[in-house]
Structures are given as C-alpha cells and as structure tokens.
Amino acid sequence: MATSSSAWLMFSDHYPEILIAIACFLIFSLLLSARSSSKDSLPYNWPIFGMLPAIISNNQFNDFTTARLRKMGWTFIFKGPWLLDMDYIFTCDPSNINHMFNDNFENYPKGELGKVFDIFGNNIFNADGDLWHDHRKMAQTILWDGNYRTMQATFIRNKMDNALIPILDSAACKRKPVDLQDVLLRFTFDTSCFSVLAADPESLTMEFPPVPFSKAADQALDAALTRHITPRLIWKLKRFFNVGSERTLAVAWKVIDSYIYDKIAELKAKRKLVGKINSYDAVSFYMDNFNIHDDKFLRDNAFTYLLAQRNTQSLTMTWLFYALFENPKVELKILSELKSIVDESSERKFNDGFALFDSNMIQSAIYLHATLCEALRIYPPVPFEIKDAHKADVLPSGHKVRAGEKILFSPYAMARMKGIWGDDCLEFKPERWITGNGTLKHEPAYKFFAFSAGPRICLGKELSFTQMKMVVATIIYNFHLQMVKGHVVEQSNSILMDMKHGLMVQVRKRSVM
C-alpha cells in the first residue's frame, strides 16, 4: 500500500500536467453530460455541483429555462452547489407571480437582492417599506406631470427630425447598412438624458461617437448578472480584492458617477447663474417641487430613470422590428393604419418630405399599440427577475418557500406556455390584443408582466407606450427596413434581452404620401 502511495506521489510530482489533463477531462465530461441531456428534462443534480453545470454549459439561458418550465408544469426547484445557498425556485406560473406581487407583496421585498444592484443606490428600484412609498409618490408626481410629458414629447419629435430621420435617410441614400439596435439605444439615451438631466449628449449623430456612459452601464448590468449566478461570499471576496467582474464594475461605476454628477453640477450652476428656470426634467423637479438638492439622492434617482428609459424602450423597439421582418403582413397593417391617421389628421407635420408623428396623432393607432404589446409579450426587455422571500411561504403552485429562498420567475417563459397564452402562443399575433369591438384588450399584469405588477407596477407605462409609438410610427411610415441577409440574431445572456450581434438593416425610403 505504501509503495503504491509513494508511486502516486512521485507520479504527481513529475507529471502534474497529466493530473491537470485528467481533471480537465472530468470537468469537460461533466459539462458535456449536462449539455447532452434532454432539453426538456430537469437538469441533473450532481453531487457537490448541483444543477449548475447545466446552466454553465448552456449559452441560451432563457430558452433553457423555458423548456424545463414547460416540462415541469411551470415551476421547478433548481439545486445549486452544496453549501453555497444557491438553490432557486424557477417559475412562470401566473398564480405564483400574482401571489408574490399582489396577494403577499410584503413578504417579497427587494431585501438582500438590493445589495446585488447596489450601483443603483438608495432609490425607488432598491427601496422597501416607507422609503419606497416616498420614492414612488415623488416619481408619480414627476412622470404624470403634464409639463414633463409635453417637454419629453417635444424633444423626442425634435430628435427624430434632427437626428433619427437624417441618419436613416443617409443610410438609404448610401445603401449602407446600419445597426438598428445601436441607433435606437443612442436615440433613447439622448432622450432619457434630456428628460432626466436637461442635457442632450448628442450620441445619435452621423459620426456615431463612443458613449462611455452607455458602455459602463452595460458593464454594470453584466456584473450584476454575474453576482446572481455567483455565491454571495465569492463575489464579495472578488469585490474586496478588486478582481474580475467586480473590478470591471468598480471602473464602470466611476464612469457612471462622473457623468451623472457632472451633469447635476452643470444644471445647478446654470440655475445659480440665471435663477430658477422653467425646466421640467426629473432632477429639476426634485429640486423645485420637493426641495431635494442632495447630490447623492439626485444621482441615484437619475441613474434609475436613465436606465429605465434607455434600455427598455430601445430593446422593445428593436425586437419589434425584428418581429416585423419575420411577419411582413403585420407591417403592412401598421402602415395602412398610419396612412389613415395621416390622411385624417389636421396636424400633419412634414419636414423635407418626411412625416413626423406626435403624441396626439398616434393615440388612435390601435393596431400599432397592439403590436408593441405583442413585442413586449414575446420579447420582454427584462426576461427574468428574482425575488427573496422574507418569511417562509407556500406558493399557489404548492411549492414551499423557505425564508430567504430565492425565486426566479420568467416572463419570457410565460409567453411561450400554451396553457397561459393559448395554442398560438409562439405566433407573433397583435390581433390577440384587440377585442371584437376594435378596442385594446386588457390582460392582468401578472400575466403580461412587461411593466411589472402589483404595487410596484411601472408608473411610466402609458408614457412609454406613447413615446415608442411616436418613434416606430415615424420609422415605418417613412422607411422600409430589411434585415441584412445572413445576419444572425441571437439573444445575449444578460439581465436585459439585447441582441448579441445587434440588428443590421438595410434602409429604403418609402413613397406613401
């Protein structure tokens, strides 16, 4: 026995690379086994590793989760590695979502998950209890203010006139493909900066300049996703030693803070120089209406508003156009509706032969609104969310929840369940949102979760619809877009459902006036 032990030690001393190769082979075999298992079966629960190898080996998390939820009746238990507190309940059951966001709302606060998104600071996104109520009341006052909405609508129209249309027109004239996702991200970044900070960064220009803030924000969200799938102790150690994704987050955080604090300082300096100005941006609103001048408070809320507007709107519109490429009959119906609106409108606005749709003109665009709803259903900009249980609970599905246990729910998967949306759930079908009387059909928020549900439902829902309809209508009426042949559309593995390779399109001017 001693001889064989000595031989093993000698072997390991002289041939460490062979041991490394053996270890790599075993790990590779584990991942291969996880990857080759039936796509509809529950992930194999390995000793020590749990079900994590199945996640690591899969590059399409949303589709992976959807297949398992479909097989397991909309809810299953995900077992993480031993001793690392990474067990989850995965669900797309509307009754469970209604329970967490409505019936037992107080038991599912932001809690510990707020620490994962600490870059947002102490604001409406991370707050709980009375502090959250206070933030929400202030946000409601801002977002529902008539002057704020008018200012935004005017700026969006001007941005379409002076930036969006010229760029698409140039692409059409030069027959040069453009990345529509990038165009829309820049557009919504400019509009959100103006509505929040009274500043136009002019990121959407012919030169397509670098946008350090946007890059940093994307890196910060990626780091947050890494925290979600990493044991808490590990990512906190990485943060302490400033390595890996935590180092990337720290650098991105500085870029974000520098940009927002600079804009707040500029706005305050302008106000000090000329006195109170009639500006209805969010930061000015906090200072004028609530007498809040603390830079940290303003920074935290500004960052939340910026990301909420920039990311969700741009990604929704990007996926909508992709859906139109796959369903050209839907685009023709939208175009027909827009022609009728333009013909009947007394507020027809043209510039250099291009039609501009304002907030009043698109109110009657029922089919366009339904198409946006369908895009949000099938391609939710936030494909999954995570909740922590404050106390032990039992979900309507019958699954027991331990205090502190995490629940991942998937609006993306919900949209793909026949038992929830019908046998045609995989079809892009705006008609499902229109009643027999031609009005918009309402679906409960816990089923159509694009704007959250319950007390935390998005306050800017209708404002967001109005703004997106203005942009989409203006693009569709004036231009015909086609996806570049051979372009691959693939979801990123991210907290947000952006396109990994963008959306490359060819642009052609329409002749519809």
Swiss-Prot record:
| EC number, UniProt record | 1.14.19.50
Tell me the enzyme class.
Answer: oxidoreductase
Q: What are the GO cellular component annotations? A: membrane
Q: Which InterPro entries match?
A: Cyt_P450, Cyt_P450_CS, Cyt_P450_E_grp-I, Cyt_P450_sf
- Could you tell me which cysteines form disulfide bridges? none
An example of a Pfam family matching this protein is p450
Alphabetically sorted, this entry's keywords are: Alkaloid metabolism, Heme, Iron, Membrane, Metal-binding, Monooxygenase, Oxidoreductase, Transmembrane, Transmembrane helix
A GO MF annotation of the entry reads: heme binding
Q: In which tissues is it expressed?
A: Mostly expressed in stems, and, to a lower extent, in bulbs, roots, leaves and flowers.
- Residues that bind heme, according to the entry? 458
Q: What is its main location?
A: membrane
Cofactor dependence is on: heme
Pathway listed for it is: Alkaloid biosynthesis
Top-level taxonomy: Eukaryota, Viridiplantae, Streptophyta, Embryophyta, Tracheophyta
Q: What does this protein do?
A: Cytochrome P450 that catalyzes an intramolecular para-para' C-C phenol coupling of 4'-O-methylnorbelladine in alkaloids biosynthesis, including haemanthamine- and crinamine-type alkaloids, promising anticancer agents. Catalyzes the formation of (10bR,4aS)-noroxomaritidine and (10bS,4aR)-noroxomaritidine from 4'-O-methylnorbelladine.
User: Which GO biological-process labels does this protein carry?
Assistant: alkaloid metabolic process; lipid metabolic process
How does the protein's chain sit in the membrane according to the entry? Single-pass membrane protein
**Catalyses which reaction(s):** 4'-O-methylnorbelladine + reduced [NADPH--hemoprotein reductase] + O2 = (10bR,4aS)-noroxomaritidine + oxidized [NADPH--hemoprotein reductase] + 2 H2O + H(+); 4'-O-methylnorbelladine + reduced [NADPH--hemoprotein reductase] + O2 = (10bS,4aR)-noroxomaritidine + oxidized [NADPH--hemoprotein reductase] + 2 H2O + H(+)
Q: What's the protein here called?
A: Noroxomaritidine synthase 2
Organism of origin:
Narcissus pseudonarcissus
Transmembrane residue ranges = 14-34
The family annotation for this protein states:
Belongs to the cytochrome P450 family.
Q: What does the UniProt entry say about where the protein is found?
A: Membrane
Lipid metabolism is among the record's keywords: no
